Structure formats: C-alpha cells, structure tokens
Amino acid sequence: MNNKLNAKIEYDLICIGGGIMSATLALISKLLKPDLKVLILERLNNVAQESSAAWNNAGTGHSALCELNYCPQEEDGSVSIKKAIEICKQFEVSKQFWSYLVNEELIDKPEDFIKTVPHHSWVIGEKNSDYLEARFKVFKEHYLFDSIEFTRNLCKMKSWFPLIAEGRSEDEIMAASRIDRGTEVNYGALTKQLFQILELEFNTPAHCNMEVQDVDPSADIDWTVELKDLKTNEKHNIESKHVFIGAGGASLLLLQKVEIEEKEGYGGFPVSGEWLVCKNEDIINKHNAKVYSKAGPNDPPMSTPHFDTRYIGGKRELLFGPFAGFSPKFLKAGSNFDLLKSIQFDNLSPMFGAFWHNLPLTKYLMEQVTMDHEDRMDELRKFYKNAKSDDWELLVAGQRVQIIKKDDYEGGRLQFGTEVVSSKDGSITCLLGASPGASTATHVMLSV
C-alpha cells in the first residue's frame, strides 16, 4: 500500500490515519463520487496497527445487546434504553454498509472479519438481577431487541456460558440475558479489506510511513498538509479542499495545530487497556459467548468487565478484561511526551476541572496499575470460578484518549465516547474519543 505519492496535485480529501475511520470515509466518498481525488496518509508502516488492530479493541459489534452502561436505571426504578437504541441503530448502519460491499462482490469473505457470537449480560445479587429483568422487559417491547431471552435459572446459564456457571450453586442469586444475533468483529481484518478495495478498485492506496506534521490554511485552496516521508526524510506540502483527522489518540495533537476556533478547550486523558488471554484450547472451546457484567458503582464505563470469545487470525480466542493501565502516550507507538504536549493554555482549566471532578477515576486507575497477575486472576474468578493462573497471560491492548472538554458548571469534564469536531464550513473534521468507536464508523463517517 505504498504507491508513489503525488504531492503536486490538489486533492478533494486527505484522510490522516490508516484506521477504520479513514478507510470508511475514503471508501464511501469514492463509491459516491469515483472521480474524487483522495489521499490517505499513515505514519506507521502498515494500516490498522493502532486502535483498529484486532487485539487493541474488544471486537464487540457494539449494538447495546449486552452493554449495561447504555441502559441506566432511573430514580423511579424504570430503565432507559434511549442510548441503547441509538447505539444499536448506528451499528446496523455499519452492517448494512458491509452487506452492500459483499453484495457488490467487493468483499468476498465476510467471515474473515465478522462472525455470529451470542451476546449476554450477566449479574450477581438481587438488586442487579431485578434491574436486568426490568431491562429485559423494556427490551422485549422494542423491535431491535425483541429476540432477547432472560433467565435466573442456573441450568439455563450452563447452556449459555458453561464456564461461568461452573462451580456455582442454585443458591446463588444471579440473572442473565441473551441475544443470539450478537457479533464478533475483527476490525483489523475489516480495515485491511476496505483499504484493499480502495487500492484495487479505485487506485487509492494508503501511503504509509508518512507523518503529518501540521495542517495550515492555504491561500490557493482550503488546507495545506505538511508531511514527512519517514523513509526518505523528504518533506511535502499537499493541498486539499477537505481534511479528515482520524489518527486515533494522535488526533487531538493534530487538531491543536489547526487554526480553527472550534478546537478551543479540548484536552485528552490517555488510558491503556490490558486483557487476560487464555492459553488453554480446551477452555477456549468451552465458551462461545460475549458476556458483559456491570462496572463497580464508582468505576468508569470503560471498566465494564466482560468475558469474550474472539476470532483473530483464523483462530478462536478467549479473553477477559479490560484492565486499565496508564501511559502518557496517545498511541501505542506514540511519545511519552504526548500528554504533556497536549496541555495548552485554552485547555488547562478544563483539564484541571475534569481531574478534580473525577477523583474516583484517578483512584480506579491507581488500583489498576498496581495489580499483579494474581490480582487480575481474582477478578477473572468472579466470572470463571475455576480459572487457573497458568492458563492465562496478560496482553497489552490499545491506547484510548478520553475526551476532556469545557463545562460551564464544572470547568471541565471527562467525556466517554466519540465526538466529531468540525470547522464552521466543514472543510476540516477531526474525530476524538474512543468506544463505541469502530462499530459506529459508517454512521459517524456519513455525518462527516
């Protein structure tokens, strides 16, 4: 994916970043208007190496079938599914786009990136079980979720997820829900297929080893992108009518260099993820489910524990997590100075406000980074009681940069999810944030 870069022409669109967001936007643009001049730039030596890489995310097709943080319980005891409906519809748009590519024979092996894996929610305790049943009843009335099943029966749970049910007694108060049509998605494999379509069908390859150093207004056209070829050390100034910054955690650092007022006040807080990954194939083959539970009362949504079947590189896998780590880097291949460089005068107050009003998050991160292998195994055993330490190893996942933005009441707040920041005229757009991320790529890129 390294056809020679043509720096002399004026482009209609430059996509910065070689992940699923840039791939989706570039492909939609070329499908709608094949004569558009599109340039894709990636700093690393291949695409889909950061957040889109298979092990760097959970691989869940986020459709709110099992993620309980999308269904808060109100003070009157009712369960709101407004956010769940929104997330589910957004993922359906992504599936429709991928189905279109399959029907047009642009993708010939969808099974290489998407498989059906049932999605479950599972909770312990009377209060949590009552909540899950209330959620089930509301879900059952909505067409997006009407295939949902619910049980408090241990025997039924054994048929759904035998490893979790193993070693438990009928006296334990538990509840679970299930939707069969859940998905497991290898976003790394998908991203590479999208870039392959762009290269083979539209002669629009991703140019790797290209580091974007600045984006400036241009006198002749809207924007000039300054970049460096990391192989030759050559520098280029390339002009484009539109620019999309989809560089994962590094998007914030690039946005801060762009001369638009909409960037003011944004900051970021990096959090790394870690998984426990099973090494025992006999154990792996006993579990065919994605099982999400509830985060602790003071823990952030990103801490929601889950026990998941994955398919990566043609092999079935089993993981548990996430566990949080801390690194000042905004990307796995980033710099230890990323966080420091991101602190500027206009976001100093929001960042301080976000820190001050999120002390429980700081406490949570401190507890997480001091965990050893047995501490993590103890967390796993809350799901899988008979888990043996020697069957599991730690794997470091991707970096996430949570959004910090101005807040009139608190000065600044930490925001989970993704956000699109655009100039008034829409000529430059930047995607910030994390989960549900890749699942909503098509919806988000259509809005861009």
Where are these regions (language model features)?
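Beta1/beta-strand and adjacent pyrophosphate-binding region of the FAD-binding site
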Residues: L5-M21, L39
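Dinucleotide-binding Rossmann-like beta1-alpha1 core, especially the glycine-rich loop
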Residues: G59-S159, E317, K329, S335-D338
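Flavin (FAD/FMN) cofactor-binding and adjacent substrate-gating region
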Residues: D108-V117, S121-Q196, L200-E201, P205-H207, ...
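Core beta-strand elements of the Rossmann-like FAD/NAD(P) dinucleotide-binding domain
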Residues: I9-Y11, K231-H242
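C-terminal catalytic lobe of FAD-dependent flavoproteins
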Residues: E172-R181, A189, F330-V448
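Short beta-strand to alpha-helix junction loop
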Residues: K82-K95, V123-D130, S177-I197, H207, ...
